[in-house]
Amino acid sequence: MSRYTGPRWKQSRRLGLSLSGTGKELARRPYAPGDHGANNRRKISEYGQQLREKQKLRWMYGLNERQFQNLFLRAGKIKEGTHGDNFMILLETRLDNLVFRLGLASSRPQARQLVNHGHITVDGKRVDIPSYEVEPGQVIALRERSQNLAIVNEAIENTVSRPAYVTFDDTKKTGSLVRLPERGELEPEVDESLVVEYYNQKL
């Protein structure tokens, strides 16, 4: 299954969740797109709820189905912690996501583009793989030639706060994952236990 490339505002309204993190998509119409979106209150089945949570989380992090499923299977092989918590941590420690969390990009799609185009380094080495798993202590930075990118400077200026598990140096435009995140620090709008239930039936 390919990655969705349509309007993110439609996804956000369909899920009732701001995928951009700004909340603008839901400010005027906090219901699903379509003429009857505001009055669509059909009861969702248990399977429908599981599927909805899976899609919500997958679209939030911008993964296609194969990438998402493979990461889920990998999380299940980690011996410590719960399957759901480990899955969330693996999603959160992707390089593209941490570029976004550090404020070097205004959205995850923009962060993924920065990584793909070779603007990002990890411990001084260029990394152009968005799915690269960042380890605590590793330093994420912009390449020298990318220091003055307008979209990056704008993103940094508009960043109000950053998660407690990262640090950022505004002067050097470098950041680091200081520790693995705890579940309570991650997306509260998602019930990953439903995602686990969904895949336990499918796989």
UniProtKB/Swiss-Prot annotation:
GO terms, molecular function: rRNA binding; structural constituent of ribosome
InterPro entries: Ribosomal_uS4, Ribosomal_uS4_bac-type, Ribosomal_uS4_CS, Ribosomal_uS4_N, S4_RNA-bd, S4_RNA-bd_sf
Family annotation (SUPFAM superfamilies): Alpha-L RNA-binding motif
Gene3D superfamilies found in the cross-reference section: Ribosomal Protein S4 Delta 41, Chain A, domain 1, RNA-binding S4 domain
Summary of subunit composition and partner proteins: Part of the 30S ribosomal subunit. Contacts protein S5. The interaction surface between S4 and S5 is involved in control of translational fidelity.
GO biological process: ribosomal small subunit biogenesis; translation
Record protein name field: Small ribosomal subunit protein uS4
Function: One of the primary rRNA binding proteins, it binds directly to 16S rRNA where it nucleates assembly of the body of the 30S subunit.
